[in-house]
A protein has these predicted regions:
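Acidic/His- and Gly-rich active-site-bordering loop/insert found
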Residues: 2-110
Length: 110
Protein backbone atom coordinates (compact mmCIF):
# COMPACT_ATOMS: atom_id res chain seq x y z
CA UNK A 1 0.00 0.00 0.00
CA UNK A 2 1.73 3.19 -1.22
CA UNK A 3 -0.38 5.95 0.23
CA UNK A 4 -0.33 9.40 -1.33
CA UNK A 5 1.98 11.85 0.44
CA UNK A 6 -0.44 14.54 1.56
CA UNK A 7 2.22 16.85 3.05
CA UNK A 8 2.84 18.62 -0.27
CA UNK A 9 -0.82 19.66 -0.45
CA UNK A 10 -0.28 22.26 2.29
CA UNK A 11 2.61 23.92 0.41
CA UNK A 12 1.38 27.32 -0.93
CA UNK A 13 3.49 26.97 -4.12
CA UNK A 14 1.95 23.58 -4.86
CA UNK A 15 -1.54 24.93 -4.19
CA UNK A 16 -1.03 27.81 -6.63
CA UNK A 17 0.16 25.49 -9.40
CA UNK A 18 -2.65 23.04 -8.69
CA UNK A 19 -5.29 25.77 -8.79
CA UNK A 20 -4.20 26.75 -12.30
CA UNK A 21 -4.07 23.12 -13.44
CA UNK A 22 -7.56 22.45 -12.07
CA UNK A 23 -8.87 25.59 -13.79
CA UNK A 24 -7.48 24.37 -17.14
CA UNK A 25 -9.04 20.92 -16.61
CA UNK A 26 -12.43 22.41 -15.68
CA UNK A 27 -12.40 24.66 -18.72
CA UNK A 28 -11.47 21.72 -20.97
CA UNK A 29 -14.42 19.75 -19.61
CA UNK A 30 -16.70 22.71 -20.38
CA UNK A 31 -15.39 22.95 -23.95
CA UNK A 32 -15.91 19.20 -24.52
CA UNK A 33 -19.10 18.28 -22.60
CA UNK A 34 -20.51 14.74 -22.73
CA UNK A 35 -24.25 14.25 -22.19
CA UNK A 36 -25.90 11.72 -19.94
CA UNK A 37 -24.00 8.83 -18.47
CA UNK A 38 -21.79 8.44 -21.54
CA UNK A 39 -18.58 10.22 -20.54
CA UNK A 40 -15.62 8.19 -21.86
CA UNK A 41 -13.35 11.19 -22.56
CA UNK A 42 -14.02 12.90 -19.25
CA UNK A 43 -13.69 9.64 -17.30
CA UNK A 44 -10.40 8.77 -19.01
CA UNK A 45 -8.95 12.20 -18.17
CA UNK A 46 -10.02 11.91 -14.53
CA UNK A 47 -8.61 8.38 -14.19
CA UNK A 48 -5.30 9.44 -15.78
CA UNK A 49 -5.05 12.45 -13.46
CA UNK A 50 -5.74 10.34 -10.37
CA UNK A 51 -2.98 7.95 -11.44
CA UNK A 52 -0.61 10.87 -12.12
CA UNK A 53 -1.37 12.28 -8.66
CA UNK A 54 -0.36 8.94 -7.11
CA UNK A 55 -3.78 7.84 -5.87
CA UNK A 56 -3.41 4.35 -4.37
CA UNK A 57 -6.11 2.65 -6.45
CA UNK A 58 -7.99 3.87 -9.52
CA UNK A 59 -10.99 1.81 -10.64
CA UNK A 60 -12.45 2.59 -14.05
CA UNK A 61 -15.71 1.54 -15.69
CA UNK A 62 -17.68 1.67 -12.44
CA UNK A 63 -21.36 1.59 -13.38
CA UNK A 64 -20.41 2.47 -16.95
CA UNK A 65 -17.99 5.39 -17.19
CA UNK A 66 -17.59 5.96 -13.45
CA UNK A 67 -14.18 6.35 -11.81
CA UNK A 68 -13.29 5.60 -8.19
CA UNK A 69 -10.02 6.72 -6.63
CA UNK A 70 -8.94 5.19 -3.31
CA UNK A 71 -6.43 6.85 -0.99
CA UNK A 72 -5.40 4.82 2.04
CA UNK A 73 -4.86 6.45 5.41
CA UNK A 74 -1.62 6.06 7.34
CA UNK A 75 -3.14 3.99 10.15
CA UNK A 76 -5.28 0.84 10.00
CA UNK A 77 -8.92 1.50 10.82
CA UNK A 78 -8.58 5.22 10.13
CA UNK A 79 -11.78 7.06 9.19
CA UNK A 80 -12.56 7.34 5.50
CA UNK A 81 -14.13 10.08 3.43
CA UNK A 82 -16.06 9.55 0.20
CA UNK A 83 -16.43 12.26 -2.42
CA UNK A 84 -18.78 12.12 -5.39
CA UNK A 85 -19.14 14.38 -8.41
CA UNK A 86 -21.33 14.43 -11.50
CA UNK A 87 -19.30 14.76 -14.68
CA UNK A 88 -21.96 14.61 -17.35
CA UNK A 89 -23.31 17.63 -19.20
CA UNK A 90 -26.89 18.63 -19.89
CA UNK A 91 -28.65 18.71 -23.27
CA UNK A 92 -28.81 22.51 -23.39
CA UNK A 93 -27.62 25.13 -25.85
CA UNK A 94 -24.91 27.28 -24.30
CA UNK A 95 -25.52 31.01 -24.73
CA UNK A 96 -22.39 32.20 -22.91
CA UNK A 97 -19.51 33.90 -24.66
CA UNK A 98 -16.58 33.13 -22.32
CA UNK A 99 -13.30 31.57 -23.48
CA UNK A 100 -14.31 28.02 -22.61
CA UNK A 101 -17.78 27.85 -24.17
CA UNK A 102 -18.99 24.40 -25.26
CA UNK A 103 -17.92 23.28 -28.72
CA UNK A 104 -20.54 20.52 -28.69
CA UNK A 105 -23.84 21.71 -30.16
CA UNK A 106 -26.72 21.18 -27.73
CA UNK A 107 -24.56 20.19 -24.76
CA UNK A 108 -23.15 22.18 -21.88
CA UNK A 109 -22.21 22.03 -18.21
CA UNK A 110 -24.74 24.07 -16.27
Amino acid sequence: MNSVNLDKYSDPFFLGETKEELRRIRQDFHVHPEIGLVTPRTSRIIADLLKDYGVDEVHEGVGGDGVVGVIYGKLPGEASVGLRADIDALPLKELSNHDHVSQVEGAMHA
